[in-house]
Amino acid sequence: MMQRPFRPEEYSLKETSPHLGGGAAGDKLTTTYDLVEQMQYLYVRVVKAKDLPSKDITGSCDPYVEVKLGNYKGTTRHFEKKTNPEWNQVFAFSKERIQSSVVEIIVKDKDFVKDDFIGRVLFDLNEVPKRVPPDSPLAPQWYRLEERNGHKVKGELMLAVWMGTQADEAFPEAWHSDAASIPGDGLASIRSKVYLTPKLWYLRVNVIEAQDLIPNDRTRFPDVYVKAMLGNQALRTRVSPSRTLNPMWNEDLMFVAAEPFEEHLILSVEDRIAPGKDDVLGRTIISLQHVPRRLDHKLLNSQWYNLEKHVIVDGEQKKETKFSSRIHLRICLEGGYHVLDESTHYSSDLRPTAKQLWKHSIGILELGILTAQGLLPMKTKDGRGTTDAYCVAKYGQKWVRTRTIIDSFTPKWNEQYTWEVYDPCTVITIGVFDNCHLNGGEKANGARDTRIGKVRIRLSTLETDRVYTHAYPLIVLTPAGVKKMGEVQLAVRFTCSSLLNMMHLYSQPLLPKMHYVHPLSVMQVDNLRRQATNIVSTRLSRAEPPLRKEIVEYMLDVDSHMWSMRKSKANFFRIMGVLSPLIAVAKWFDQICHWRNPLTTILIHILFVILVLYPELILPTIFLYLFLIGVWYYRWRPRQPPHMDTRLSHAESAHPDELDEEFDTFPTSRPPDIVRMRYDRLRSVAGRIQTVVGDLATQGERLQSLLSWRDPRATALFVTFCFVAAIVLYVTPFRVVVFLAGLYTLRHPRFRHKMPSVPLNFFRRLPARTDSML
């Protein structure tokens, strides 16, 4: 199959010009939603009814209300045997899709065969009032029911009908006409919602010692360790080096705990009898509600806990309390750390857990999620492709989810959200997904919402008080290659409340103080981040509607640490991009030294002489040069936010087998021959890296051998040279030495020869430890 040619313009950022806030005309009724396009809706609030007539033979009434506008029809829930029901439900009809000039509200009596007509109320849309916040809500009124011929009948209906926008308070919970095909139990999964990340703490358990342990086997010295469990997190200490009944460890175990504290900390002291066989010598259970909280690095008081021993009597586990062993612990909840639950490269929040340590916010981030264009079909329904798209945005502890737009490749959300900003060097993440749970959350048979694409925007790359309106490409990487799924249009504004405070932040540490005073190891940070993301995804998946685990993991980049040949190549070329200016300077200096451009070389000679004669000008010259470069580049400063770059990511040039390897499970699920081939390829790459690392080590060892007398003749020569150089440099003015060294470096090619220099020859002859390698 021929691959479609790569076109970079498809994956580029495009500036847009939407009519934000209703445009510049007088139609702009509110400034609350000034980063989205205004959407008009007809709202119908059905509050309650009274004095409804009985229609059944039994003399009862099972009423419900049907709101009808053209081909759209929404119904309330029905009540059994109730003549004065209360519904308090809101219906919203998009003005773009209104096909009638009259809205009809019909009260019906639910029946087994055919629902009976009780009465109706009609409204002419031309007479419906307009209402936009911050106006007060429209007060509902009683309306007398009518027959189809216009005659009044018994019964009244309390209603409120108005024209409004998506800024209306009733909008999030309203029944929407574009979701008319969704059953009642699926409506919860399509509404917009705001979620909060649970408050996360690091739990530090300092296991100090135990006393008076009673082993089951008293003929041997016990090999004792402590096992700690918090929910599904399990850690253990090393085996105590003191094989006694009073072992000591003084070892820290770190966990992640989330408020409200539902799990208990369980510690058990165990004796390792043989591999795979351990005896529990005692256990204690500690509630986190009573654990002290620490805001700095000061030591808290330790505490002794009694160890309970459980024995099995007649098949039942009972507590044995003959003699109590004890364990010495220092436990605290660390409030001075920031619990990392997202990749450190894309952090959206850097504040410590304890709110007392938070600094004041420096600004407001506003995000308008407008529309999407050109979305691809994500699933098949009734024999045709369809997409039910929604967006999720995450910044700090606040997650937002837009409503789901049913069956549309160009969905319009026009929803606006705000966040407080505490640090500009943070990233907001916006993801677009396809909703696969429209038939009710539990009826989807384990379906997973499909990812359509993701956008990241770093706040420090934005100018303050400027509105950025762009169409961002939605790009996903599949085993078949890179694929554009469409575009999402966003409006972003970062407003700074104090420029001085924001500038001051650039001089502050990125993470809270405890990360530097009492740092965690790299392995601890990785393990704790994995536990934190697991807790966050579990908690948010229990919300209603749930923010499902696959969504949270995609937004938090859970699999970013997995091996990828493509990412390795991309990172290598990123390093080369960083080093390329240095390489260019080295090439330029080599051309100067070889007099490729005599005029430039002469000018460099003159500059060099000036700097030797006036060395106090060196640093001012360097900083002035950097200043001029920065001012010169200001004209070509980036005017657009950064976006996903397929060329930088090496996504368009990745080999299919490399992509298949990147999407492989862990552990692998591929056939043995493919795994063997990939292992051999990895060995080949690692072999080249091994050679480069070995060469670097060789050069370093040669430097060390200058004074090690490993080669006595070479060291004697070097020591003699150092003694002579010390005398010469002592009696010779420093400026003369620098001047002569510079002239020698910049000498004309006729005074050069192609053979290596004497110092280089000497250095290459020095011994290294490669001779001792197996």
UniProtKB/Swiss-Prot annotation:
Ca(2+) 2 binds at residues 56, 109, 111, 116. Disruption phenotype: Male sterility due to defect in anther dehiscence and mature pollen grain release at anthesis. It is a multi-pass membrane protein. Gene3D superfamilies: C2 domain (2.60.40.150). Ca(2+) 1 binds at residues 56, 62, 109, 111. Residues 1-25 are annotated as: Disordered. The chain crosses the membrane at residues 575-595, 606-626, 714-734. PROSITE patterns: C2. One of its GO terms (molecular function) is metal ion binding. GO terms for biological process: anther dehiscence; negative regulation of auxin mediated signaling pathway. Residues 1-17 have a biased composition (Basic and acidic residues). Its cofactor is Ca(2+). Residues 23-143, 182-305, 346-472 form the C2 domain. Promotes nuclear translocation of the transcription factor OSH1, which directly suppresses the auxin biosynthetic gene YUCCA4 during the late development of anthers. Reduction of auxin levels at late stage of anther development, after meiosis of microspore mother cells, is necessary for normal anther dehiscence and seed setting. Required for jasmonate (JA) biosynthetic genes expression and JA production in anthers. Interacts with OSH1. This is FT-interacting protein 7. It comes from Oryza sativa subsp. japonica. The lineage of its organism: Eukaryota, Viridiplantae, Streptophyta, Embryophyta, Tracheophyta. The gene is FTIP7.
